Amino acid sequence: MHFVIDRDIFVQNVNHVSKAVSSRTTIPILTGIKIVADHEGVTLTGSDSDISIETFIPLEEGDRQNVEVKQEGSIVLQAKVFAEIVKKLPEQEIEIHVQDSFVTTIRSGSSVFNLNGLDPDEYPRLPVLEEDHVFRLPQKILKDIIRQTVFAVSTQETRPVLTGVNFEIEDGILTCTATDSHRLAMRKVPVEKNDDELQFSNVVIPGKSLNELSKILDENEELLDIVVTENQTLFKLKNMLFFSRLLEGKYPVTKNMIPKEAKTSFAVHTKAFLQTLERALLLSREGKNQVINLKTLGDGVVEVTAITPEIGKVTENVATQGLEGEELRISFNGKNVIDALKVVDSESIHIAFTGAMSPFVLSPTDHDQSLHLFSPVRTY
C-alpha cells in the first residue's frame, strides 16, 4: 500500500475513528486503526465492543485533491501512537508506504517514522445491517437531542439498561428518554421515515456511544440516516458510518411516571433561576448532599434555601410568573435540576408540583417537545 494524503483531512478522520478505539480491549488488534487504500480513496476504521466508526476519504472533492493512491492495499496501525504522529507532522502532505512484514513508513517533509503494523486480514469485519427500520434527522437536531437527554443516564452498572437513552417512534414522533431513576429527561421530535408504518420501542443506545457521536455531528441541517436493528444501530453521515451496539434489557415505561395535573405551579426565567440554584449549591455542595429547599411565599415569590450546619445558610427570594395552587415546601437534588436547566433552550420554564413528596416536572414555556422530571429528597 502506498498513498499521499492531505494532512488536515487525514488528521480529522483519524481523530474521528480513534473515538471508537479502546486501549482496554481484550482483542489486541482492536487497539489499532485499519487503513485501506483503493481506486476510490482511503477508508479508516476504528472499533471496540460497543462502537465502530468507518470514515471514507475520496480521492477528490470538488476541485480539491485529497489523496493520491499509488498502490492499493491495507494495514492496521496502533491507534494512539499513530494519531499522535499524524497530528505532529510538519508538512501539509503525508506519505504512507507499507513494505514487507507490515512495516509502515510515514513521511512528511524531513520527518520519517517507521511503525510495526498488524495483519489487516485479522481485523473484524463491520456488520452489514438490514435497512428495514430507517429514519432521518438533521444533524443539529440529533446533536440537540443528545445534549438534552444523555446527561440524565445512570452511571451505575447495577441496571445497565439505564446507562443508555431509549429511542422509540410512534405516529411519526421520535421520543428519546434518559433516566437514572432519580431524574428523567425526555425530548420529542417529528422524523422523516422511509415507511409510514415505522414504529419501534425499547431501542436503548449507550450514553457513551451518543457522547462520542455528538462530538462528530455538525451544527447544520444536513440529514443523516439512522438504521435500527435488533441489537445494533447505525448512523449514516456523509463519508462516515457510526455503529453502536444496543443495550439489552427492558427499558422502564416512563409515560406513567409523568404527573398529568399540578397542585402548585409557576413559571420563572430560566437563566435567573439557574443562577439562583448555582448560588445555593455553593453551600449544599459543601455538605455533600446537594439538597436545595424551595418554599412558596405568596405574591408570586418563592424562597430558595440551602443549609450546611457546619458552614452556614443561604436564602434567596425568586420572583415568578403565574404562581398558583397550594402552599409548598419541597427539597430536591440541586445538581440534578441545574443539569437540566443548562440544556433548556427556552428563556422561561414552567415547573409543576403535585406535593412535597411527589415527582415534579420542569418544561419550557414555549413548546412541549421536552420535559424533565425529578424525585424530591426527603429531609426528615
Curated annotation (Swiss-Prot):
Stored InterPro entries: DNA_clamp_sf, DNA_polIII_beta, DNA_polIII_beta_C, DNA_polIII_beta_cen, DNA_polIII_beta_N
One example GO MF annotation: DNA-directed DNA polymerase activity
Keyword check for DNA-binding: yes
A Gene Ontology BP annotation from the UniProt entry: DNA strand elongation involved in DNA replication
The keyword Transferase belongs to this UniProt entry's keyword annotation: yes
Main location: cytoplasm
GO cellular component terms given for this protein: cytoplasm; DNA polymerase III complex
Cellular localization per UniProt: Cytoplasm
Keyword line: Cytoplasm, DNA replication, DNA-binding, DNA-directed DNA polymerase, Nucleotidyltransferase, Transferase
Cited Gene3D superfamilies: 3.70.10.10, DNA Polymerase III, subunit A, domain 2
Matching Pfam families: DNA_pol3_beta (PF00712), DNA_pol3_beta_2 (PF02767), DNA_pol3_beta_3 (PF02768)
PANTHER family: BETA SLIDING CLAMP, DNA POLYMERASE III SUBUNIT BETA
Family under the similarity heading: Belongs to the beta sliding clamp family.
Role noted for this protein: Confers DNA tethering and processivity to DNA polymerases and other proteins. Acts as a clamp, forming a ring around DNA (a reaction catalyzed by the clamp-loading complex) which diffuses in an ATP-independent manner freely and bidirectionally along dsDNA. Initially characterized for its ability to contact the catalytic subunit of DNA polymerase III (Pol III), a complex, multichain enzyme responsible for most of the replicative synthesis in bacteria; Pol III exhibits 3'-5' exonuclease proofreading activity.
Subunit structure: Forms a ring-shaped head-to-tail homodimer around DNA which binds and tethers DNA polymerases and other proteins to the DNA. The DNA replisome complex has a single clamp-loading complex (3 tau and 1 each of delta, delta', psi and chi subunits) which binds 3 Pol III cores (1 core on the leading strand and 2 on the lagging strand) each with a beta sliding clamp dimer. Additional proteins in the replisome are other copies of gamma, psi and chi, Ssb, DNA helicase and RNA primase.
Protein name (database record): Beta sliding clamp
Organismal lineage: Bacteria, Bacillati, Bacillota, Bacilli, Bacillales
